[in-house]
Amino acid sequence: MTPQEHLPYADPEKGGLKLLAPLRVLDLTTSIAGPYATQLLADLGATVLKVEKPGAGDDTRAWGPPFLQDVSLWYLSVNRNKHSLTLDVSQPAGREVLDGLLAQSDVLVLNMVPRVQRKLGLDYDSLKAAYPALIHASLTGFGLTGPRSDFPCYDLIAEGYAGIMDLTGELESAPQKVGTPAADLLAGQDLALAVLAAYIARGQHGRGTQIDISMQSSMTRFVSPRLLPYLGSGELPRRSGGKDSVIAIYQVFDTADDPLSLGLGNDRIWQRFWQAVGDPAFGARTEFASNAHRRTHREAIVMRIAELLRAQPRAHWLALFAEHSIPAGPINRLDQVAQDPDLLDKRLIYRARASNGAIPQVGLGIGFDGSQHVHRKSPPALGEDTDDVLRGWLGYAGPRIDALRERGVI
């Protein structure tokens, strides 16, 4: 038995969102960032055609363990609501198929470096004359220009370039990667946002757009609340285990049993905290009158709060802080997140039926008219929609499809 057994099923009556139903997206990406971007578009209702290498498919299909019924769970995390077509675009017959699909698509998404795009004739300059309305969206490690534009890149590499690893962890520890593929997910989110903007603009002027997303740039923008203060002050932030926030009290504290997070983000919350814990006089001291004052005396304040919170279990403090509108929360493990009744009720975490049994999913998490239901189609098996796409999009008959398959084109 796996943890998904307690998850609610996606409601088939809901049918998913259809906000982007007219949009057709041709997705030639692999790994996480690009597929995450196109899953966001698919969740909103776009038709996403995932073009994969015959026999191998998306790199994430081989990422594991863990696997579920021989399917990579990493692959399952970023590929729902899509259709899979296997196609060797390097063969002339494969390129002919791709050109037919491009003629019927609104968006092309790539995560090939510029050199490979040019080699395959899939760069913006090679396509814009034949497909002037096509939105050409490129997601690479370092963008389409610059000295690193042809460098390969993964999330780990982008995090290192952007400075986030140097800020993550304890001061005495080595730099640490963020606990999720943050650069992948942020760059993917940026691409989805950019596609929506380009789609709106095309509706106004009828032309396509070249979109250039860099994982390094997306991740660098992510650290702007730390980078900008350095640029303006010259004070270089260092790893601190999350204890160096501009907010004086904004960190994790131990309690009598489990740790909690606490954020006293303004003067009103500061006063409410000390009222709640029964020591309003401490909170009213003039040397703690503002956040700047409290930062000066942070060490003494942290010692006092730590002493207080160790006296009672976490549940006691969270109930008290909720009553007094004080921002605080648990430090959940993923197994606890997976059992959060609010997330389950909203179907953010759910399971869906697939050809080989039930699969777990994490939804979009955005409500539209009171609903967060996005599931229309489980992540596809490799090439499961190839014949349907060739027939439905391009009008190919059975013998022509069979010939392509025999030649290894599909």
Which residue ranges define each predicted feature?
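Beta-strand segments within the central parallel beta-sheet cores of soluble alpha/beta enzyme folds
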Residues: 208-216, 320, 401-405
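Conserved Rossmann-fold dehydrogenase catalytic segment
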Residues: 144, 172-180, 203-219, 238-245, ...
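Short, well-structured beta-strand/strand-turn elements
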Residues: 48, 322-336, 396-401
